[in-house]
Amino acid sequence: AASDVYKRQARTCADILKSLEDLKNLPANTPTMPPLFPTEADREAFNKRHHREHVHIGTLEGAQGPHFLGIDAGSTTIKATLVNDDREIVWSSYATNEGSPLTAAVNIVKQIQSQLPEGAWIARSCATGYGEGLITTGLHLDEGVVETMAHYRGAEMVSPGVTAVIDIGGQDMKYLAISDGVIDSIAVNEACSSGCGSFLQTFAQSMGLTIEEFTQAALNSTHPVDLGSRCTVFMNSSVKQAQKEGASMEDIAAGLCYSVVRNALYKVIKLRDSGELGDTVVVQGGTFLNDAVLRAFELLTEREVTRPNIAGLMGAYGAALTARMHYSDVADGLDLSLIHI
């Protein structure tokens, strides 16, 4: 009899593998959020809106006349833009500073100088970011500007009448509330990474994914896990619990993208109602290059926002615009011979 029972219960490896595969499709007990894209039409409309040009990007070929350099020296990266008199970007750079922002800035200036055609020159320069003072002094730049003002000027150029600017980088996050062209309030997060890009980078690595693969997985999610808005330490336990309950990698990735945005909105900005953001919202910073984060932001705030095609360069662009704004024909321009490093 025992032999008959064994025969009836015997299963092939293929049967077992199929059962395991079917487990993936079982609904998890963990609460879920709306999918980032309920329909393919939603995805197509999103792509059409966010993959268009906002700032014209040209080249140095045939460039003539005065040009204006903006350098944004961040904690780990350095960004630079060179704009012409029409405010078009003709050269840009986004790179890590490799622990020496001043050396990185010098290399940027040297690259530009070597590529500038005859008849074109750097008429005025401006620095912003964490390393504003160091770069301004070390390179003998014309001026520095606080990064909030640099980001505002860049956003205003992209979306005139901007009412809110949200900038999420790898390590920090900035929020500007603007009314009638005046910055009303500022919120900055520099203590916790749970509302920043490094939060996602950490979890992507723990899942064995590149950030690009992580983003694609999130975009393909059908039942994003509701992981709440918690710090990185506690989020680890939430993710492990969701995995135990059968949540897919895609649904966890999307849930983490939602969490980053919720942390930014409700813990840093302390938003009570999405109407507080106003009607013209510009998002920028490297983290918003992640389409899943951008989409989660739109769904949570119930509004379409503008992500410039230079989302990671907006501080540098605003600094370049500042340099152009303060330019006069009597300025000497940037003298590379003064730089010794």
Model-based region annotation:
Residues 1-3, 130-131, 259, 272-298, ...:
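Glycine-rich phosphate-binding loops at beta-strand->alpha-helix junctions
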Residues 48-57, 255-277:
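Phosphate/ATP-binding catalytic cores across multiple sugar-kinase/actin-like superfamilies
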Residues 237-266:
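Adenine-nucleotide phosphate-binding core of ATP-dependent small-molecule kinases
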Residues 1-4, 92-97, 143-208, 307-310:
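Glycine-rich phosphate-binding loop of actin/hexokinase-like ATP-binding domains
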Residues 48-64, 132-169, 174-179, 185, ...:
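Conserved phosphate-binding catalytic cores of ATP/NTP-utilizing and phosphoryl-transfer enzymes
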Residues 194, 201, 205, 210-243:
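Conserved ATP-utilizing enzyme core subdomain
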Residues 11-147, 279, 295-309, 329-335:
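N-terminal glycine/serine-rich phosphate-binding loop of ATP-dependent small-molecule kinases
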Residues 2-9, 341:
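Short, small-residue-biased leader/transition segments that mark boundaries at the very start
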